[in-house]
Amino acid sequence: MHNENQTLIFEISKEGRVGYSLEALDVPEVDLADVLPANLVRSEAAELPEVSELDIMRHYTALSRRNHGVDSGFYPLGSCTMKYNPKINEAVARFSGFANVHPLQDESTAQGAMELLYDLQTSLVEITGMDEVTLQPAAGAHGEWTALMMIRAFHEANGEGHRNKVIVPDSAHGTNPASATVAGFETITVKSDDNGLVDIEDLRKVVGADTAALMLTNPNTLGLFEENIIEMAELIHSVGGKVYYDGANLNAVMSKARPGDMGFDCVHLNLHKTFTGPHGGGGPGSGPVGVKADLIPFLPKPVLVRTEEGAYHFDYNRPQSIGRVKPYYGNFGINVRAYTYIRTMGPDGLKAVTEYAVLNANYMMRRLEPFYDLPYNRHCKHEFVLSGHRQKKLGVRTLDIAKRLLDFGYHPPTTYFPLNVEEALMIEPTETESKETLDAFCDVMIQIAKEAEENPSIVQEAPHTTVVSRLDETRAARTPVLRYQKA
């Protein structure tokens, strides 16, 4: 039996009901008012739910059944790389030596953990073609900002603090211009050409003596490889700027091509995406930043180094460093999972990851091409972007298609992004899905396309089988109710 109207845990609370019992107090009782300032002592008890253990288990188990994750179903969320997270990663992350280590304990007692971090840095240096890596940033956008702050420090150290422009393509992730703004730069947008790639001629028009950097994802958010990357890098370098690599799409080129060999000066990675840290629930993530030699002095400190004696040490003596960007040394647990993944796969395995990710995306694209518009009809990399323009003419929007997918148990693709594709549907299958899964999803997408032609109302009014139908998203955004208030 399924309770369609799931109550809040506060609403099943009954005064005096408890889930656990404690032993009788065997030490002198202390009055909080005697040991805490008066302003820190509550005048009345906090309104916390009073429930039994059984109530708790049933409540959260019921909620868990409403969640969708990669362990429960296909998750083709474009530009998010929702691949399966191997459970060996979880087992290793739970080793007592990793799970119980504390960032403030003496370095001499944490050499094993530090060795893992150092080896992970070394692996990421090899994968990216950079010269040094910091594991400090907590996630992707944090890595972007960290890299931009290093670029800013580099220019200022060279007496070129006037460089205040960061160039981003019109297909860029929204975090790129946001990170540039937070780092104190002005964003300049460069257009895409008819092939979905950066328009070189438009790029020539916007570069100049005030150019600090070009931010680029390769392949880009259309799933297309920027074929002119060498020319673009040379152009930016010719005016004294730096070229930054957004690692969101590294899954498409891993062990096939390296950002450092393409002319990039720095790169951020998403270990929670490409290297199988669980994600989708708001964190934790890991966004390491790799740099070429001339940016090494500006890395966040402390920098993890290995001494001549083979010991591992956090080096704080970095006078040009941009300083800490996160307490302690990054999200250690995610780094352990990424290290486990890299060691499990090896170079050949990582190469196969890329090959299957690209194969799966191209297979799906060709199966769906007859039923949806394909703005850029060419081989893609790890993801591709369809357009619901054809369906829009029939009164069915991309949003409707996404909602209809829920009826079949699928998480929808990314919708309405990139912004330069009308009614966009961005699909990324990843390498971990079978042909059977891809076919089943494509069959549903084809069915929805036919429904848009023959019975559009069933798509327009979807979803029909979920616990809740369409929410008033505008009202939710403008007047959010973020905490429980007793009636």
From Swiss-Prot:
UniProt-listed GO biological process terms: glycine decarboxylation via glycine cleavage system
Family named by the database record: Belongs to the GcvP family. C-terminal subunit subfamily.
Keyword Oxidoreductase: yes
Gene name of the record: gcvPB
Lineage, uppermost ranks: Bacteria, Bacillati, Bacillota, Bacilli, Bacillales
NCBIfam families for this protein: PRK04366.1
Molecular function per GO: glycine binding; glycine dehydrogenase (decarboxylating) activity; pyridoxal phosphate binding
Disulfide bonds: none
Protein name: Probable glycine dehydrogenase (decarboxylating) subunit 2
Enzymatic reactions: N(6)-[(R)-lipoyl]-L-lysyl-[glycine-cleavage complex H protein] + glycine + H(+) = N(6)-[(R)-S(8)-aminomethyldihydrolipoyl]-L-lysyl-[glycine-cleavage complex H protein] + CO2
EC number: 1.4.4.2
Keywords: Oxidoreductase, Pyridoxal phosphate
Positions bearing N6-(pyridoxal phosphate)lysine: K273
Cofactor: pyridoxal 5'-phosphate
Reported function: The glycine cleavage system catalyzes the degradation of glycine. The P protein binds the alpha-amino group of glycine through its pyridoxal phosphate cofactor; CO(2) is released and the remaining methylamine moiety is then transferred to the lipoamide cofactor of the H protein.
Keyword Glycoprotein assigned: no
Quaternary structure and interacting proteins, as annotated: The glycine cleavage system is composed of four proteins: P, T, L and H. In this organism, the P 'protein' is a heterodimer of two subunits.
One GO location term (cellular component): cytosol
A Pfam family it matches: GDC-P
Top-level class of the enzyme under EC nomenclature: oxidoreductase
